[in-house]
Each structure stands twice: as C-alpha cells, then as structure tokens.
C-alpha cells in the first residue's frame, strides 16, 4: 500500500487555528441537530414522547450501523506500510521545522457509527505520529481519528506541547460536551496524556496508555545523558542503539509483522522484506537527526516524566494501561505502580509482545478497548447502545486460534427443531430475525457458551446477547490482568448484566437474547447435580416476551459429565479455612443477584470448584420447537397463565436433556478417539457425523 503525506489531511498547526467541527467530517445523517431541534429534544426528554423518539432513532441507527462480522480492515496494513509512510513524511517539517500539527489519516475513512467519539493519538518521543497506522482502519470505523505530528527539529517545550493539546481538547469539548474524548498515548505520548488529564479533570477523557515512559528516570539512558551533551551537536545520530529510542529496535520491528502460524520459509522471507525496507530508512533518519536533536528529545522526555509523576494524584480520567512484557523503557513493575497510583485504571499485560505494541501484527487495539468495556459515546457507558458487534478478524482470532483446541475437544453437535417438529442438524429451526429468547440449562463452568456464540455468528450472523452475572461488569477485578481473559470475552461477544431493564431494551431492539434462569447456581453446581435445574419461581421473562411478541426457544445441552469431574464442590470448599475466607471476601465485594429468592435457587455464591478433566466426550445441543409469543395477550394479564407457560418451558428443557442423554449413547463418535480417526481419514475440516435424530 503506497502512501504519501499528500494522502493525509494535514491540518494547520494545532496552536494556530481551531479545527473544523467533527460533524463536518461525517455524513449528513449524523450531523449535530440545529438549535431548534435541540430545544425540541430537551422538551421531549421531559415527556414520554422524547423517550419514544429516542427509541425509534436508536432502532434506526442500529439498522444502518455496523453488522455482526463486519470487515474492520484489521491486518491489511503492515510494518512495511509504516516505513513507507515514514519515508514519505517530512520528518523535519518540510525543511523549516514548524510547530506541532494534527493530521487525519485517510486510511481511517468516514466512521460507520452514529456520532463517533473523537480519538487523539499522541506519539512517542520520535513525534512522527504514524505508529497507529496498523490500527487506522479498525479504529476509523468507530472513532474520528486525529494524530499529532511533531517535526524532528521542533523545539516546543513540554508545557508548550501541553498548551497546544489543551487548546484542542477544550475546543472539542465545547463542541460536544456530552461526548468523551479518547487519547491514545504511546511511550512519551502517555506522559502527555496523563499530564493533560491532570490539568483538565472537568473534561471527560478516556486515556489509552501504551507503555507510558513514566519510568524513564530508571533507565540506563538517563545516566549517559551528560556524556551525550559532550558530543558535537551537529554530529548525525547513526548508532542503532541510540536510534532505537526514537524509532525502535530494527530487528524487533522487523519481527513484529511476522505471523505466528507461518512456515519457516515464509517467516524468513517476511523478516528479510521488513528489514530491507527499514535499513535505508535508518540511514535517512540518522542523517536528519543530529546529536543536539537527540539530546533535546531526551531532555524533553525527562521534563515530561517529572511533570507527569508529580501530578498523578490529580488525574481523574478513565484509564486503560497496556504494558508489553519485554518493553524497553518501562521496567518491570511500572505498570503495577501506575495501577496503584491512578484512581480509575485497568491494566492489560502483553507479556510476549515487544515494546512496539501498536505495530504487532496480532495486536488489535479496538478489540482490547471493547473487551475492557471502555468504548462509549456518552458520559456513561451503555452496554446496549454502545455495544460494537464482533468483527470478522475478531471472530477468526477468537474461534480460529484462542478457542480452536477447546472446540476440537468439545466437537459440539448442534440440533434444532423445525416448526413441524422435525429435528435437524444445524440452526435451521431457529428464526433468522429477532427478537428471540433462548432459555436453557447452564452447564458446569459455562462450557457451552463459546460454541453457541460461534455457531450463531457463523450460521445466523447473530450476536447472542447473554444476560450474565454482574461480576463481569461491576467492580475492578484486576487479578485477571492478561491479554484476553474470559472477563473480556463476555462483553466482547455481547454479554450484558442481567436485569429486567436490559432484557426489555434488548427485546425492543429485536436482539437474540440468551437467558439462564438457573444462573451460576447451575454453572457452579455441586456433586451429583448434573442436569438439575435451579429455576426460581419468577416467570417475569415470559410476560415480557409476550409483550414484545418474542419467539421463545427452550434448549438443552449435555456433555459436561463427559468432560469434567468435580473433585471439591462448594460444600467441601467452605470447610477449608483459607479458601472459605477467600470465597466470603470475594462475594462481599461482588454485587449479588436473587438476594430475595429463598432456597437453593437463590444460593448464587461465586466460587471455583476443583475439577479434573476426563477423556473428552462430546457436547450436544438441541434447540426446541419455537414458541411464538405474539398474540398471547392473556399471558401479560394473567399471572396464572404466565406461570403455566413458564413451567411448560422448564419441562421442555428437562425433556430435551433427557432426549440428548439417551440419544448420545447411539453416537459412534462420542469418544474423542473415534473422532480423531475420522478426521485423520476425511480431514480436520470435515463435519463429524453423529446419531440420527
């Protein structure tokens, strides 16, 4: 992909003139309302009319917005494109220096969502501003992206840079005071972002910090800074060890674009291609950057680090800190220090990645933001309207790599029931359009969810909006700080906190809703409780489904007893002193559900049972005959009718599981050994047969 600086909309110097209104960069359907319309909205907000109008508008936006498995363009750009862009960029500001300036990468294109938030990228100490190039297309779908470029020969001091950015941020905030401003700070840019947030606590900022250089004072380079000042100022910086602090380590940068699953020959070819593209650039960059420039950059970094560390306690912004494991500048433990010092901070570690995290071929920044539940368009995150559907690249990564082995071990069999009662393989019996409510049994450790989410996306292109426990959304359980934990996968693939209001809103938007009435009592059941339902006597979802004409599909799944064996359940764990205190402490901090429900149905204690794996069997699903709730007005008014339908659905789920337990005995490929032989004969992509329904 050839690039040139002419392909980027370079805006005037940031301190010179204000930028255009964000709405002028978007389609007319997403422009800000006129003053009269805004006044009407304020009036309507106080009445039911405004609520109905906003709902209709939200539904309309959903219809023309992003669809599940949309192409986000991630992976199209490579490190070589970064080198090409760097070569085409006038690093010295066109020969005359010049103040810092903002530019809009054309690769981002027009945003595909309604009223996207603004995203500002602050570069590292090199100041080029192109380090985000491999993320441009994916971020450009949901953000309005602008990047800061600081010419090599620019001598704006640290507080001068802050003033430039502050003017821009305040201008944008005045244009859209109810929308957040995202700031991505890479290395030195992380210091700028934190300093900016400390000076403007009243502005709604969301900071994405990538290996912030807040620990530069502890690095060896600071110790040799006095020696560098003694070197002649006009001497070109040609030493790779010094250049790597500006544009990175050549060998590491050549390696970041190599895919993990490529052959040795392709790996060598890709590495050679990247390195050959970079070496001429190093020579060019080395002749542009003089020793006095390097010394200035390092002093600028030192002043920024000192300024930032002295004001960490004043930062009020929401923060996502991304730390790679073998980074150059932040030493081990810096991410933990910042996590403790900052008020609202989430951390994600990428222990096998280099310090050039943004240019890793497998690193998708938008996926990380979505998984951490950090994407929002208003002052508060709305899990319904702010949800971004999974992309095709996320689908391939999650189910083609992360859960590939699990899918192979489970070898799920999906069956559904047509309206005439015939059972077929696949999801043909499930409607193609919502609103649909899937109600069923929660297997041990929720092992059935990933396969269901994959199959509905693959066959129906439908996102399952799982009504999940609040533990996935409330609280900051950062003990699971890793690249992609299950806590991130749940919101990434449509999970929302279980509540009547969220269920109501999902039905209103014609979504596919997944409900487990048994909750974690079923998913964390005790010994000898396999396939036992723990449904409370609360048929409210039936009445709500009737109100919206929802199609209810009872389903069951079996196979957990072929996969895992419970060694210690909750009744045994609570008798072990240390473990008992840990469970009690965790549940005290965690918001509970069903506190008013008596009996075992309300015993929703979060814990982790000790289990042992078995020689894998197989997972079986059966989606029952659809129950059309449209026209069932009597269910809404008559509680007795609602209770009876609720019991009928529960009975159908139990019958489905009894059917599957009986029929799986007839499956010749229930054992993983038989399935392995079959795939060895017919190929790993061949669908493995099962019993005749």
Segments and roles (model prediction):
Residues 7-11, 71-94, 343-388:
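Catalytic active-site module of serine/aspartate enzymes centered on a nucleophile-bearing elbow/loop
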Residues 76, 112, 143-184, 198:
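Active-site loop/oxyanion-hole signature of alpha/beta-hydrolase fold enzymes
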Residues 198, 202-253:
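Flexible "cap/lid" loop of the alpha/beta hydrolase fold
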Residues 314-316, 321-323:
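Short beta-strand/loop motif that positions the catalytic acidic residue
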Residues 434-503, 508-509, 519-537:
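Catalytic core of membrane glycerolipid acyltransferases/transacylases, capturing the structured
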